[in-house]
Every structure is written in C-alpha cells, then in structure tokens.
Swiss-Prot record:
The UniProt record lists the keyword Secreted: yes
Species lineage: Eukaryota, Metazoa, Ecdysozoa, Arthropoda, Chelicerata
This protein's UniProt keywords: Disulfide bond, Ion channel impairing toxin, Knottin, Secreted, Signal, Toxin
Tissue localization of expression: Expressed by the venom gland.
Subcellular location: Secreted
Disulfide-bond pairs as recorded: C55-C73, C66-C79, C70-C118, C72-C89
Domain notes: The presence of a 'disulfide through disulfide knot' structurally defines this protein as a knottin.
Annotated signal sequence range: 1-16
Protein name: U15-barytoxin-Tl1c
Family affiliation: Belongs to the neurotoxin 03 (Tx2) family. 03 subfamily.
GO cellular component terms given for this protein: extracellular region
One GO MF term attached to the UniProt entry: ion channel regulator activity
Amino acid sequence: MKLFMVLVASFAFAVALPSKKREETAAENELTGDLQEAAQPMIYAVAFPEIRASCVIGWKQQGATCQRDCECCGVAATCITGDSSTGFCGYHQTPNALGQGILYTADTIKNGFSAIFCAG
C-alpha cells in the first residue's frame, strides 16, 4: 500500500511539474518581449543619432565656400582650398584609421589656434 501511495504521489508530481514549467516559459517569453520592446528605442538612438546644431550662427556648414578655417562649423572642420584662394568647408579624409586620427587631432589643434587669430 505504501508503494502504491509513493507511485501515485510521484505520478501526480510528474504531471504537475511540466505545467508549471510551461507557465514559467510563458512568463519568460513575455518578459523577453517586454525587454525587446524596451530596447528598441535605444537601438534606434544608436543607429540614428540625433543631429544637434552645435555651431555658432554665421559659421558655415560642410560643403559651403570659405576662405579661413575659423569660418567652418566643427571641431576638426577645415577650409580646404586646393589651388584657389576660396575653398570649401570639410574634413581631411584618409582610408587609414591611424592616419585619420592623426589628421583629426592636427586639424583640431590648428582650429584652436585659428580661432584665436580669427577673433581679433
């Protein structure tokens, strides 16, 4: 009789256990869906950053004509002249990542000194 009670109890426990697991799985799926919905705006913010106007009124945007570096909007933006006296606002580019970092740093320092001379 005790063996029968042990078998019945273990069978009842085995039947009840998977249903609890299904409930837990459903709750986990719901939480996962909520997490994905909450993460979607963050993914969008990383993929499409907000463009903020950080330039002083009167500074020229990339591609506009210029004569001096201090006229261009951007920390490392320079007036690329080429052969003529008037140029356009832009950034020096190189396919090498290290070279690009060096150009960016050099242009930033040059723009710092250029801003001092343009203010006067």
